[in-house]
């Protein structure tokens, strides 16, 4: 009796959906690390928000200046404060650029997003 060969998964080829901002969430680029889990983030609406990194994200992800993130503005002081919800990897940023969700100018500090 001949048995079929097992299919082997090639490492690094795992398909993961790229999360996009939902509801009132925004794209943002980290401008400055302030310490104690706080960062200044330039958001897609042109405002600079002081955002905190929630504990569950702080323990798992290292966020640096220049990283593309998703920001959830707070219900109170929504144009000044927010939470960082997700950090994109470089591969995910490249995919967002190819699909036209963000522009290179937004990442480098120029104009805002493509709608």
UniProtKB/Swiss-Prot annotation:
Q: Provide the S1-like domain boundaries.
A: 14-89
Q: Where does the secretion signal sit in this chain?
A: none
Which keywords does this Swiss-Prot/TrEMBL entry list?
Answer: Initiation factor, Protein biosynthesis
Q: Is Thylakoid among the key words of this record?
A: no
Which SMART domains does the record match to this protein?
A: eIF1a
Pfam families, alphabetically? Answer: eIF-1a (PF01176)
Report the function annotation for this chain: Seems to be required for maximal rate of protein biosynthesis. Enhances ribosome dissociation into subunits and stabilizes the binding of the initiator Met-tRNA(I) to 40 S ribosomal subunits.
The molecule here is called Translation initiation factor 1A
**Species this protein is from:** Pyrococcus horikoshii (strain ATCC 700860 / DSM 12428 / JCM 9974 / NBRC 100139 / OT-3)
